[in-house]
């Protein structure tokens, strides 16, 4: 990851995609607005579960001119990853699951989250009630890199409206077939979610915004 950052690979890849209409279509067809309120742009894909993948995660906290609710968005991952802060500053929190219940702790619904191969469709199966303990606050500034193990439960603090946050993510091999998510607003049953893939024009607008250029 360090070598990719030194060579400014995020900027080079974005400009290469913007300069090639066919690549713009290909990348748009595998990118989408994630349910956790960020744009997931898959720059370089890899269908091998033991392979690596490069993505951009760009937070836009005013989708459709609606206020984003105060949702927990706490989760872990199927894979470990390295993340370079390309724009802005990332604030996040890490948690562990409490082993003993306490009346002083918030109670969450814990779900088993299974995404589709394309990622834009997923199911959540209710697992159990759980309580969490926050163990770390993280602040990672523009230009810095951090590593997150797939078993780490965390959440990214959504940036304030108008603030830029974009990360360049190198995803490692898949470690398991599911993740866990914790919240208080999903029902205690199975739910499904589906969001559309991006259109080329939509992706172009988002990439130009990330670069800080006028559309």
Provide a role label for each language-model segment.
Residues 1-58:
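A short, N-terminal "cap"/entry segment at the start of jelly-roll beta-barrel domains
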Residues 162-178:
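A short hydrophobic beta-strand segment most commonly corresponding to one strand
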């Amino acid at each position: 990851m360090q070598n990719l950052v030194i060579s400014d690979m995020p900027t080079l890849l974005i400009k290469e995609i913007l300069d090639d209409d066919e690549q713009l279509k290909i990348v748009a067809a595998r990118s989408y607005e994630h349910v956790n309120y960020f744009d997931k742009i898959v720059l370089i894909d890899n269908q091998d579960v033991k392979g690596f993948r490069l993505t951009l995660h760009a937070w836009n906290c005013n989708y459709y001119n609606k206020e984003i609710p105060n949702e927990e968005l706490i989760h872990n991952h199927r894979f470990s990853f390295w993340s370079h802060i390309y724009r802005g500053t990332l604030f996040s929190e890490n948690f562990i699951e409490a082993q003993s219940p306490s009346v002083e702790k918030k109670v969450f619904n814990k779900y088993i989250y299974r995404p589709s191969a394309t990622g834009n469709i997923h199911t959540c199966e209710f697992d159990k009630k759980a309580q969490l303990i926050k163990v770390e606050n993280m602040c990672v500034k523009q230009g810095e890199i951090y590593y997150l193990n797939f078993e780490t439960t965390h959440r990214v603090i959504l940036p304030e409206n108008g603030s830029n946050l974009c990360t360049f993510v190198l995803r490692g091999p898949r470690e398991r077939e599911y993740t866990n998510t914790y919240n208080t607003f999903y029902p205690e049953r199975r739910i499904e979610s589906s969001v559309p893939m991006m259109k080329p024009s939509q992706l172009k607008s988002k990439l130009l915004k990330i670069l800080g250029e006028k559309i």
